[in-house]
């Protein structure tokens, strides 16, 4: 365990019907880019501290164990040059490391001050001590060995006295336990069932005699010292099932298992297994001006995110993630819009990941040269371009999904695959072609059988159609397991509803009867915001509203209208920036210019040079200081213009404690009923993240405000088509201030509001939704035997279950309030940031739906207690409530209606504290 490794953890399916036998789990990760959120579901997470600058602030309340070699040191360690020669006894020939003389008090003091103390400051609350038996290589006599053991024990006790809250894990060190007075949590050892013989470069079974000796040591440690025991075994990276079987055997001895490869550079397996959700999305760019406009982003995000995956995006000509991705990533998707984009280094890297068993999906064009040296690794065989149009000889049901296969077929990549399960098989003359298939390594769909225009040769928004069902293909190609899927569309069984307004047109003058000569903002305030108490996020553009902006003579009036809007209890504040950049990348690249290659870059504020911090944080501070009262603060930035902010703008928002939203174009309608117009929930940009608006505004539905001006009412079509057959999106009423400038446009907005009021929805603020999207990216899902364990930030409160998974058993569950089987899906309601349950269901009472958030939930022997807080009159339903009474403040609540064992309740209040359901059974 001395090497720097890229291990992480977890994917053991264990015995399918068995409950986990261990209450604790361990994980070891010594690689770069430490996934703290995933490690946090483990009781004993161990990391290599040199791979990070410390434990991130958000995780400093949790215990992470830093790897520390107490017996020897590599010359590459930063502190090595400060060691005195007399502190070293000799060398370890296997590793080239130097062995400490721990009988030296000066060395012990040095290690405490120079090694342990900095780690404690970095947030580590535990230490994993390795190389505790290295002294045996140089200490040959019993007296010498006892001297070194006593020195080791003295060092550990010294660390424990210096940091009394620290906890420790030993790698072996059995003989030290009688000598230490430190709080040891666990003892680990390698190779209980299978080991790696480095000299022979092979895996080998552990002899029964060796296993029994180690089990005896483990048993003695548990009985005498009440510590956990951990066994670390080794298997080849591609042998996941073998790893699961070994882990299952280890757990049968009451020993915590960890099974990985000898290099420890992949996610291992334990009885508690995290299901990886990250997927590497590799794009080759496009003809568009920005990578964010490539097909991989426009079309590729939704099928991945809807199935619970979290894309990490890289261009094919950039550096790929280091190490073995097996278990760390759910798979790799390579989406290319033209041929011959990959180079030799990328192909070699892709082959390496394929050999390690990482599922790979190739979309658009082959990710390796079909006649190159790596084609054979993927089973590709080049075929001559057909002389006559090939005929279809076999077709998967998922092909021809939104657009029938053309009668005259052209092949972008004339290939056959010898290892494939064909999804589309063609024949021309003597040759067979398979342009779409799943394979043992993943799968592929090549153009024109992935996405195709309804008008051949024409490109344009709304013309493209999926030729293959993207959900089905991604699921099968990436070999995704059936797992609970974090869902941002729903809470407590109801589809979310929120509204937000971009401030464009705030100073414009309205044409609406009764408001001629008054601003659009005034019309919106009086006719919409005061009439509909729906949670709404309202923004302003500082450069238009402030006295130092473009309209100083109107500023007093505009600021007062904004104050009146923000004073409404159902309105939260957002900034729509300072100068409303129209093209963010160009505006930032040319800060002093007003026009760029795409047109005007921003509003013409005199003397201003574009600065992303001023745009975002500065405008939010203006709102806080001039337009808000009481405890209200600006919550968000709503991106302006092309809604493609730069990473620097996103960083400014995050560092300014502002959420962000806007971008992408979900505009599916009955005239364009295609999933190519259902976009993702957001996009990562380096270390930053842009949250997309779920729906689009009236500008799109009115043909960029050229008419028909009543066109926004068609957003109701979008709402319906993103609800059935799948709930892809919440209901998001998104508009500009100028929608209130024309009678037809205003009436369309009122129509949309009235429709939303008539639906059984769950109102929230846009900021609530943005937090759910961010939580989606880091929520951790683990399986333990046949039970599930979830951990997140507590913002996202819904999991969607595939048909293959049973509903939860509620007795004995943690963090589960109930569930709802609805048309678009089966939704599990979380009541906290952590949840744990086994499959059920059981005929016990449960929360079936609510239009408010759970602020407290506690299951009791004969019912449960709960509190709800929402934004409108409460509506909720309780299942299996026969023979139960719902009490509040000493009285009982009467259901307004009953459907079998489902009882529906209403209250004119927006929140109720300490509701108590008591049942006689």
What are these regions (language model features)?
Residues 223-236, 480-510, 529, 610-613, ...:
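Catalytic grooves of carbohydrate-active enzymes
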Residues 76-78, 91-103, 356, 363-373, ...:
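Metal-dependent polysaccharide deacetylase catalytic core of the NodB/CE4 family, i.e.
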Residues 256-273, 310-317, 476-493, 523, ...:
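C-terminal domain-boundary segment and adjacent tail
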Residues 133-155, 161, 172-183, 608-685, ...:
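Catalytic domains of cell-wall/extracellular-matrix polysaccharide-remodeling enzymes
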Residues 263-265, 362, 755, 761-921:
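Non-catalytic C-terminal accessory domains or segments of carbohydrate-active enzymes
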Residues 275-278, 306, 400, 409-495:
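A glycine-centered loop/beta-turn motif at secondary-structure junctions
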Residues 340-412:
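A glycine-rich, often tryptophan-bearing local segment used as a flexible ligand/cofactor-contacting loop or short
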Residues 29-43, 47-50, 289-370:
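Helical hinge/lid and interdomain linker segments adjacent to catalytic or ligand-binding clefts
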